[in-house]
Curated annotation (Swiss-Prot):
Pathway: Cofactor biosynthesis; thiamine diphosphate biosynthesis; thiamine phosphate from 4-amino-2-methyl-5-diphosphomethylpyrimidine and 4-methyl-5-(2-phosphoethyl)-thiazole: step 1/1. It catalyses: 2-[(2R,5Z)-2-carboxy-4-methylthiazol-5(2H)-ylidene]ethyl phosphate + 4-amino-2-methyl-5-(diphosphooxymethyl)pyrimidine + 2 H(+) = thiamine phosphate + CO2 + diphosphate; 2-(2-carboxy-4-methylthiazol-5-yl)ethyl phosphate + 4-amino-2-methyl-5-(diphosphooxymethyl)pyrimidine + 2 H(+) = thiamine phosphate + CO2 + diphosphate; 4-methyl-5-(2-phosphooxyethyl)-thiazole + 4-amino-2-methyl-5-(diphosphooxymethyl)pyrimidine + H(+) = thiamine phosphate + diphosphate. HAMAP family: TMP_synthase. This is Thiamine-phosphate synthase. It comes from Pseudomonas aeruginosa (strain UCBPP-PA14). Keywords: Magnesium, Metal-binding, Thiamine biosynthesis, Transferase. Mg(2+) binds at residues 69, 87. 4-amino-2-methyl-5-(diphosphooxymethyl)pyrimidine binds at residues 36-40, 68, 106, 136. Condenses 4-methyl-5-(beta-hydroxyethyl)thiazole monophosphate (THZ-P) and 2-methyl-4-amino-5-hydroxymethyl pyrimidine pyrophosphate (HMP-PP) to form thiamine monophosphate (TMP). Its cofactor is Mg(2+). The lineage of its organism: Bacteria, Pseudomonadati, Pseudomonadota, Gammaproteobacteria, Pseudomonadales.
């Protein structure tokens, strides 16, 4: 599948109390192309159960599920994987998951990390944070100039993450970003209907003018 559009990322604190599945389905209805399941808890049984449910939803809507920092879970479910800089070897994950799996890599604000990820078999790279982020407030800041440098040198999809809103996403897309990864601006909503509305608005940014 082509990696372009809204990249929705779950947050276990935002999506507690039974909101995970209805809110995720709303995001998928609204056009999210990728969904990253991000849960750092140690409850493996619950994580497996939730990931299986999310995989079913993604299959229903033609989207791709990506698991954060758990190559074994990704391999068990036959889904994609996202690795941070401290989450283990990308090349080892590629060997485990196979050539066809989508594997993304966090590259913060450093082009050399992205080039290394490409060499190790990444499917996409993620730069950020571009704006103030409540999820990762201490992450290194990335600039739009980084995108200008990266676009001609990286021949694979580029993801932007970090405090992105409907107001700031267009400028990043104009600089060549293929995927905008969104957490709070999508899921910090009072209802599933509002999540769907926001997802449709983000997805519309990728449509030809």
């Amino acid at each position: 599948m082509k990696l372009r559009g809204l990249y929705a990322i779950t947050d276990s604190q935002l999506l507690d109390d039974g909101r995970l599945l209805p809110y995720v389905e709303a995001a998928l209805r609204g056009g999210a192309r990728l969904l990253q399941y991000r849960d750092k808890s140690s409850d493996q049984a619950r994580r497996l159960r939730e990931a299986e449910s999310l995989r079913e939803l993604c299959e229903r809507y033609g989207a791709q599920l990506i698991v954060n920092d758990d190559a074994e879970l990704a391999a068990r479910l036959g889904v994609g994987l996202h690795l941070g800089q401290t989450d283990g070897s990308l090349s080892a994950a590629r060997a485990l998951l196979g050539r066809q799996a989508i594997i993304g890599a966090t590259c913060h604000a450093r082009l050399e990390l992205a080039e290394q990820a490409v060499a190790e078999g990444a499917s996409y790279v993620a730069f950020g944070r571009f704006f103030n982020s409540s999820t990762k407030p201490g992450a290194p800041a990335a600039s739009v100039e980084l995108l200008d440098q990266a676009r001609p040198r990286l021949h694979l999809p580029i993801t932007a993450i970090g405090g992105i809103s409907l107001d700031t996403a267009p400028g990043l897309i104009a600089r060549g970003v293929d995927l905008v990864a969104v957490i709070h601006a999508l899921f910090a909503a009072a209802s599933a209907a509002e999540v769907e509305r926001r997802a449709r608005a983000f997805s519309a940014l990728f449509e030809p003018a």
